[in-house]
Amino acid sequence: MKIINPILPIIENILGNLTALQAEGKITTQPIERIALQWYESERNILRKTTNTGREVAFRLLKEGQRLKHDDVVFISDELVIAIEILPSEVIVLSPKTLPEMARACYEIGNKHSPLFLDGDEVTLPYDKPMFEWLQAAGFHPQKAERRLSQALRANSAQGHGHSHSHSHDHHGYHHHGDGNWHKH
């Protein structure tokens, strides 16, 4: 990490998980400042945020596969620890009972270009009313909940970039701008 001024470090690496670093004795009595992120911000390579105490922090995470997760530690000193807090958000939860049902759910949701997340045996995705209603109509028995989204399935996560297919399908006028919030203009 380079410090360009005393209040604006540029974070270039994730140092580890808060619990693991505490268990290793690398974090003891230092105060812990939190940087609150929405789930979709955790995948950005370049980001500027403020900790819960008002300290500005800039991120430049350029290594392939670097994604911020809840309780990631991004700064440690004798005086301070800065850790990530992924904020809970409204989600759709699916609990497929069989592997074919899981495959069908993931395939259908993938065709609608919504990011998918694994949470144990459940599939979660950002809440969107048209998607929720479609999943109900398709017989998937979705539930609405509030959770932290993590462990995105990378093959489906089309966040932040455009893409195309060799086939076409109808999104019935709905689309999103890389944030998972489906809507019509």
Curated annotation (Swiss-Prot):
**GO cellular component terms?**
cytoplasm
Ranges of compositional bias, category Basic residues: 162-175
- Keyword annotations for this protein? Chaperone, Cytoplasm, Nickel, Nickel insertion
**Would you say which domain of life the source belongs to?**
Bacteria
Region annotated Disordered sits at 153-185
Q: Which InterPro entries match?
A: UreE (IPR012406), UreE_C_dom (IPR007864), UreE_N (IPR004029), UreE_N_sf (IPR036118)
Keyword Disulfide bond (UniProt): no
| Entry's localization field | Cytoplasm
| Broad class of where this protein is predominantly found | cytoplasm
| Sequence ranges of Basic and acidic residues compositional bias | 176-185
**MF terms per GO, please?**
nickel cation binding; unfolded protein binding
Family membership: Belongs to the UreE family.
Function recorded in the entry: Involved in urease metallocenter assembly. Binds nickel. Probably functions as a nickel donor during metallocenter assembly.
Q: What is this protein called?
A: Urease accessory protein UreE
Organism (species): Haemophilus influenzae (strain PittGG)
Tell me the name of the encoding gene: ureE
